[in-house]
Curated annotation (Swiss-Prot):
The gene is kazna. Residues 92-270 form a coiled coil. Residues 457-522, 535-599, 623-686 form the SAM domain. Residues 52-62 have a biased composition (Low complexity). Keywords: Coiled coil, Repeat. Belongs to the kazrin family. This is Kazrin-A. Residues 44-70, 350-425, 703-760 are annotated as: Disordered. Pfam families: SAM_1, SAM_2.
Length: 786
């Protein structure tokens, strides 16, 4: 609408300009005509009577006002004047026309007078005739021009009327437009008024919802607390139940062994009496030696039974279902009870063989002294066997923790204990014993890998170390085919690790290389680094949860990131291999690694410091993400505390990162920027908490100086260019890992594998001599297991 009005106004302006231009042209033509008429007036004869001219002039002067008044009257009757300027132009134009008409009439009168004079004189000069004919021609032309001017003036009047009508329409349209705009403004004011009212109602509703949300949050946290307490209580009850079950199974095992021993003793009583009767006269009726010999023999038989079949009994007892009576005493099922005769067969072989030997022998060696000596020898053999089986039992217990973690208990099939006595068959028993021996050998190899230098390892030890300690069973086949000893493992380069063992993962290669270098440094008498105690399960689960980034646990599991490999990670490694793309998360992980470096990767020191500040707002550098969430709740910001679950904010970030301020924490907590009081409260609390910790950290860092450098020749120099990144990262972080002899004092040999600590027997000599040489002194019992 506005555009059409603008176009119409422009068109009206253009028409008015054209009309003005036409009027100007007419004025110019009239002026030229006036000049020509003046020239013609000068050509009149001087003999013309003056009275006649004066009369004509007076008549013209008298007629001019009358004609002018008529023209004005006509102009007033033709219609309303559009504007003052247009009316003035019109009046002037009419005045010009009237003046021209007067001049034309004067010229006509002059022409008539000249014609009369010519007629009176009866002829005239040819020159005068020529001039009169020219004047006639010119007069005719002027009349034609005047007609054309009249036509143009009439056309202009028509255009003015048309423009006046268009202007009237435009004014009407503008009035309609103004009316429409007023109605729209009224509607807009109504809409704004309604919107304000609706906004106020929405704000009131939001406040009500916020209060309800706070109530729900409180109820949720109460439920969470109750759930946590119930879970802890259930865990305590479960652990107590497990302890009771284990105790019940031990009592069942003792009951079963007692029954077996009783059956064995009942079976062998007549034979023992037959052996003991002839000796009474020799010792002058004193039977005390026989009783003293029989009691140790019975105990030895019992111990031998327990040692020989402890592993099978444990499997049966763990698998067999238990039925509890009303008094809470767990009883063995009948199916499990049928296996007891099988266990007593070999136990009675010794006594039967000894009795038969005593009956067949009639030599003087059948005396009580000789029999006592033979029984003592048998006791020594039994004691030696008991010690050996005890070690086996302890090894099997540890091995079950290594290879059986996480497996659910399965009840044994009742058909295993049917009358066919399938479990006690020699083939099944031999298979079970062979598996136990294989597991025992693997356990011995793992213990040897933990205690002996790498250069003394054999192929089995290398394979057990790679599978159990390094958690790389996928490379076992290539290792068994190509690596036959620890010496071969020590000389492998990074290229050999990729070609010989088939390790294509650069992170796995780096992990294996760091472990080999750690063992190489340990052979120098400094022991393994503390980072060796941190396996990849601890890093991927416990440590990532502590730093508040559990979402990357799967990537750390995939690349088997342990303590040594963790100490070498850079920003590029985090982004390329572990898919940590956010800069804030990268800084969080790197600062967590820096904290571990300051603690020399000692997990015990870290846990002790965290336990000391668990209920106190001190030492925030070692705080976990959960501890920070607890602190946020303590300062009355619990509605924002859950936003830190996967944010990567932990104590090392708060203390070690100078750019971490209250605004950063507020952003991590998702506190709105318009809540200035909440942000100010958080700033004051953080300032009180972090300032003292940063000041103490600066005082600790000042006397440390630069870390020692490592000048030892490494076997990495012969690696291929494809493993250049692993070499550079290894050289860059060996100081941080603690492989330098200057930083390897007072280190512990023991490692924490993924299944926990294995029991060690016979390592007292190593623990006593650890200060002088922690890996080169071993007892004979340890070296004979190789």
């Amino acid at each position: 609408m506005m555009e059409e009005n603008k176009q119409l106004a422009q068109r009206i302006d253009g028409a008015i300009q054209c009309a003005k231009q036409d009027v100007a042209n007419l004025r110019a033509e009239l002026t030229a005509t006036g000049h020509r008429l003046a020239e013609l007036g000068e050509l009149e004869e001087p003999g013309e009577p003056q009275e006649h001219q004066q009369q004509q002039q007076q008549q013209n002067h008298q007629d001019a006002p009358v004609q002018r008044q008529k023209a004005l009257t006509e102009l007033g009757q033709k219609g309303d004047v559009a504007s003052q300027e247009t009316s003035l132009d019109k009046v002037l134009l009419h005045e010009e026309v009237l003046r021209l008409q007067e001049e034309v009439s004067v010229l006509k009168q002059v022409r008539e007078m000249l014609n009369r004079e010519l007629e009176e004189t009866g002829g005239g000069c040819s020159v005068e005739l020529m001039s009169v004919s020219q004047l006639r021609v010119q007069l005719t032309q002027k009349e034609q021009e005047l007609d054309r001017a009249k036509e143009a003036l009439q056309a202009m009047k028509t255009d003015r009327k048309r423009l006046r009508l268009e202007r009237t329409d435009l004014v009407n349209q503008m009035q309609q437009l103004y009316t429409t705009l007023e109605s729209r403004e009224e509607q807009l004011r109504d809409f704004i008024r309604n919107y304000e009212q609706h906004r106020k109602e929405s704000e009131d509703a939001v406040r009500v919802l916020a209060r309800e949300k706070d109530l729900l949050e409180r109820e949720k946290w109460d439920l969470r607390r109750q759930t946590k307490e119930a879970t802890e209580h259930a865990g305590a009850l479960r652990s107590a139940l497990d302890l009771k079950e284990s105790r019940i199974k031990e009592l069942e095992a003792e009951l079963t062994m007692a029954k077996q021993s009783l059956a064995t003793l009942t079976k062998d009583v007549p034979k023992r009496h037959s052996l003991a009767m002839p000796t009474e006269t020799v010792v002058n009726g004193n039977q005390e030696w026989a009783m003293h010999a029989e009691l140790p023999l019975t105990a030895a038989i019992r111990q031998s039974q327990q040692n020989l079949y402890h592993s099978i009994d444990r499997q049966v007892l763990k698998a067999s279902p238990c039925v509890c009576d009303g008094d809470g005493i767990s009883m063995m099922s009948s199916a499990a009870a049928r296996i007891s005769p099988c266990h007593s067969k070999q136990a009675s072989v010794m006594s039967d063989a000894s009795v038969m030997e005593g009956e067949r022998s009639s030599t003087p060696s059948d005396s009580p002294r000789h029999r006592t000596h033979s029984l003592c020898n048998s006791l020594e053999d039994l004691e030696e066997q008991r010690r050996r089986k005890k070690k086996e039992r302890m090894g099997l217990g540890s091995l079950s923790r290594v290879f059986g973690r996480g497996k659910q208990r399965k009840s044994m099939d009742p058909t295993l204990f049917d009358d066919s006595d399938s479990l006690s068959s020699p083939a099944r028993l031999s298979v079970s014993l062979s598996e136990c021996e294989e597991q025992l050998d693997r356990l011995q190899q793992v213990e040897l890998a933990r205690s002996a230098p790498m250069c003394r390892w054999r192929a089995g030890t290398v394979q057990a170390w790679l599978e159990v300690i390094m958690a790389m069973p996928m490379y076992m086949r290539a290792c068994a085919d190509n690596v036959k000893s620890g010496k071969v493992l020590l000389v492998l380069t990074d290229e050999d690790l990729g070609n010989v063992l088939g390790i294509s993962n650069s992170m796995h290669r780096r992990k294996l290389r760091l472990a080999i270098e750690d063992y190489r440094d340990a052979e120098a008498g400094h022991g393994l680094s503390k980072a060796a105690e941190l396996d990849h399960h601890w890093v991927a689960q416990a440590w990532l949860t502590d730093v508040g980034l559990p979402q990357y646990s799967q990537f750390f599991h995939t690349h088997l990131v342990d303590g040594r490999l963790l100490s070498t990670l850079t920003r590029a490694d985090l982004e390329k291999h572990l898919h940590v793309s956010k800069k804030a998360h990268q800084n969080s992980l790197l600062l967590g690694i820096q904290l571990l470096h300051t603690l020399n990767f000692d997990k015990e020191i870290l846990q002790s410091r965290r336990s000391e500040c668990e209920n106190q707002n001190t030492d925030p550098a070692v705080w976990t993400c959960q501890r920070i969430i607890k602190w946020i709740k303590e300062i009355d910001l619990k509605e924002f505390a859950d936003n830190l679950q996967t944010s990567g904010v932990h104590g090392a970030v708060m203390v070690l990162d100078p750019s971490f301020r209250s605004d950063t924490m507020a952003t991590a907590l998702c506190i709105p920027s318009n809540k200035h009081m909440v942000r100010h409260h958080l700033s004051e609390e953080m300032k009180a908490l972090v300032s003292a910790a940063r000041a103490g950290l600066e005082q600790e860092v000042e006397p440390l100086g630069t870390p020692p450098t490592l000048h030892r020749q490494s076997s990495l120099s012969s690696s291929s260019p494809s493993c250049h990144d692993d070499q550079q990262s290894l050289r860059r972080v060996k100081q941080q890992l603690g492989l330098s002899p200057k930083n390897l004092t007072a280190r512990n040999i023991s490692h924490q594998s993924r299944s926990g600590s294995f029991p060690r027997n016979g390592l007292q000599e190593v623990s006593l001599q650890r200060e002088r040489c922690p890996v080169r002194h071993f007892s004979a019992a340890e070296l004979t297991n190789v």
